[in-house]
Amino acid sequence: MAKVRVYELAKEFGVESKVVMAKLQELGEFVRSASSTIEAPVVRKLTDALQGPGGNAGKSAAKPGAPRKAAPAKPAAPSPAAAARPAAPKPGAPAPKPAEAPSSTPAAPSAPSAGPRPGPKPAPKAAPVTPVPAAEFSAPAPAQPAAPQPQAPRPAGATPGPRPTPARPAPAGGQRDGGRDGGQRDGGRGGERGGDRPARPAGQGAPRPGGARPAGPRPGNNPFTSGGSTGMARPSAPRPGGAPRPGGGQERPGAPRPQGSGPGGAPRPQGGQGQGGARPTPGGMPRPQAPRPGGGPAGNRPNPGMMPQRPAAGPRPGPGGGGRGPGGGGRPGAGGGGRPGGGGFAGRPGGGGGGGFAGRPAGPGGGGGAGRPGGGGGFGGRPGFGGRPGGPGGRGGTQGAFGRPGGPARRGRKSKRQRRQEYEAMQAPSVGGVMLPRGNGQAVRLSRGASLTDFAEKINANPASLVAVMMNLGEMVTATQSVSDETLRLLAEEMNYVLEIVSPEEEDRELLESFDIEFGEDEGGEEALVSRPPVVTVMGHVDHGKTRLLDAIRKTNVVAGEAGGITQHIGAYQVSSEVNGEDRKITFIDTPGHEAFTAMRARGAKSTDIAILVVAANDGVMPQTIEALNHAKAAEVPIVVAVNKIDVEGADPTKVRGQLTEFGLVAEEYGGDTMFVDISAKQGLNIEALLEAVVLTADASLDLRANPEQDAQGIAIESHLDRGRGAVSTVLVQRGTLRIGDTVVVGDAYGRVRAMLDDNGQNVQEAGPSTPVLVLGLTNVPGAGDNLLVVDEDRTARQIAEKRAARERNANFARKGVRFSLENLDEALKAGLVQELNLIIKGDASGSVEALESSLLQLDVGEEVDIRILHRGVGAVTESDINLATGSDAIVIGFNVRAAGRAEQMAEREGVDVRYYSVIYQAIEEIEAALKGLLKPEYEEVELGTAEIREIFRSSKLGNIAGVLVRSGEVKRNTKARLLRDGKVIAENLNISGLRRFKDDVTEIREGFEGGINLGNFNDIKIDDVIATYEMREKPRG
């Protein structure tokens, strides 16, 4: 047997697919959709369930006298007209019995019946009902499926009189009693309240008077009809023969039902074997049926195998209809339409208040499945209509179906944690309506150039909230943009956090620790350490003879090759000197003395063991002398003072010793511990004594040992881009031994060592501790002062270099430019107050480029002009630099480099300004002048002269003419003037349009002369007024 799909079975049974799916779920078979297939055993089980006592869907086609016609009603139909009608009866034929009205009264307003009543007694109805004459059936209606009709309520305790038992149509969908409310089954409310239900009188299914239904429109569940009823409600008067009323009349509030398991709780009379009332199907779907004999069986009796998966519960507390089990008024899981107390699957007009398959135990008038009045909560509950007796319309739910308790949702007590969280949320800081976490002084560590997203991750906040806060604080920042340290600190203070910016050294240490690399410590024990040469840095003021001293020591002439006679790079050299009969090696590092090279001097002091402070005997202590002294003290290195130029006229070494005493350097002859040596680098005097002092200081106060067997570590002294060699770097090996072929990482550059050169230009195979070498093979030019590391793999070197580059890039982004607030940005742009000078810097060495960039960024010529360095690099000016300058209107600065190849021709063709410098202070002075040229000119008022009005002449052509005597200065034509009267300004910004002396037009009148002045259209002048003339002259800046 082929597999059958769910929708095919639904079509065969004449029901909707969701009804079959719900029944399958009740049977424990779960399907995904209506297109799912099911196995043959499941089909048989479903067929037995639907044709058995649980519902007779699909059997109506086999009934005689009724054509099979599937007419499933949509759940959202607002009227019972969607329900099928019975086959057209002939006059005198038994009419189908309408279903009883849904119960909408609470569960216990009327007393339950103690047992079966022998004879039903007629009870007075609340309002008379006009019987419908049979003559109204003028034409038979087309055959339609029978639909259960809600029956009007009857008072509890009153039983209907006996009725004849003609054949009547079976209830929709094969509905039969016995499975609902009371009856012979226990576990439901009816069984608890009244024991076994009495048999229904045979006259229950009697036809209406006249034997035919009215031919008019069938009463529908119109939610907009008056009187709180959804059908065509009629007064509840007794009808002849006790025939049931048609229509969906709804019970009045508090009106008890006559019998059965509704809210009244009294058992209903039973007629023979055929049970009265429509029995619900699993979906509450009607189906066509033929009239059935009154005493005939109403279908298979229910059996325990048709019970739901969970035992039916007892009466549920609260209003919910008189049904059993989780379904409220209907059968558990199968609340069919038609019987009182149960809502249908699709919300057919069912019993009052009870829940269907997933109906919530609702109060009187609870929301039905399709929003029908009085219906219980259906499978797909629709909002009930308002205005029903017993309270406003509710909404169907699923509380009764899956084990959740019914009744209104209760608000549980909040835990201490919830209450504390709510309290903390109320106390949290708020900026501009944005709630922020409370820091309570907690420390947050962030790296340089961190973004708001990084900050939000640290404090478990939403980055969008931080962006909104920054907008309220007047800063335009995106979530992923690098933010300056000051901005982050401002934001942290708003939330009561303590922000800690990680230093570059700490960042680098954490980065290396992530790769299990330690920098700055010797490996091995004491036995692995060997002595190494001392590293000596020569520091001092510019032109005090530092490089000349090194030339004297090395017996070379470096000074002759330096531009401007000043050192602009760090040079590293190693010399051998005989001290006390022993050959000792000393490594010297020459640092610049110009003020622009502060960073170079700081790096030289950090990478050294001993500092030689060179002071000219004729100049004494100078600003850079003090700065170099402070660098050495900060690096905690011993200092040897070399008093140079003792052979120059006016030299006074004693004065130098006295000046340095003020800064904590006390000579040994004055009782201190600092060695002073008087030398002459030019004459070569006392050079050996200076080297001896250096060696003695190193031996006395320093432990100069290192492990040569470990991986090399060092520092980059200087780097540049060589035309034939590529990126090269002068490095000082501090520990370990550097060999050719080692994988190294220097700052954000990495590579393999292809070659090494010493300070004399000779190739070397390895370099031990305290040895300066020139390294070739790096991917790019590293920065001066970057650490050198030897790693095991190229991949590790690349990862370290890339992370360092990204970190530095973020830090640069955070430092770039001047940010404007939301309030003043628009005005600044409109007024043209923001002027930028774009620069591209190219130099011969990384240290020189760094020094030039630092000096230019420190230029301050006002807030109106800003320097923006678009690019900096080492090497010649290339075509890409010219292209960048063309697109951004930038100036290219070449420091000790020239334009290469076609770059110079391209610069001339594109009109790019390329400036070349060899001395750093020349570049700084010219850039400062260019910045001042970008400033808006400032004007000042200059008084030219004053004239007193002695006479007034009137002219019909020119107006009033003032006859004046010039008191001071001179009065010129077409200059600005103001009119003073009794020392007060009467008129401003006047123009001297005419100037005459007697009858001649003149351009100026000097002091002491008379003349005539015409002030244009201004005629309000009087005798003794003073005319003061002035002009606006441009004021020089800076």
Curated annotation (Swiss-Prot):
Function summary: One of the essential components for the initiation of protein synthesis. Protects formylmethionyl-tRNA from spontaneous hydrolysis and promotes its binding to the 30S ribosomal subunits. Also involved in the hydrolysis of GTP during the formation of the 70S ribosomal complex.
Biased composition (Pro residues): 88-99, 115-125, 142-153
Basic residues biased stretches: 410-419
Positions of region (G4): 644-647
Gene behind this protein: infB
Principal cellular location given in the protein's record: cytoplasm
Region feature G2, mapped onto this chain: 565-569
Keyword Protein biosynthesis attributed: yes
Stretches the record annotates as G3: 590-593
Domain tr-type G: from-to ranges: 531-703
Span list, region G5: 680-682
Entry-linked Pfam families: EF-G_D2, GTP_EFTU, IF-2, IF2_N
Keywords assigned by UniProt, alphabetized: Cytoplasm, GTP-binding, Initiation factor, Nucleotide-binding, Protein biosynthesis
Amino-acid positions noted as binding GTP in the UniProt annotation, renumbered to this chain: 540-547, 590-594, 644-647
Entry GO CC: cytosol
Entry similarity comment: Belongs to the TRAFAC class translation factor GTPase superfamily. Classic translation factor GTPase family. IF-2 subfamily.
Source species: Streptomyces griseus subsp. griseus (strain JCM 4626 / CBS 651.72 / NBRC 13350 / KCC S-0626 / ISP 5235)
Compartment(s) of residence: Cytoplasm
Protein name, per record: Translation initiation factor IF-2
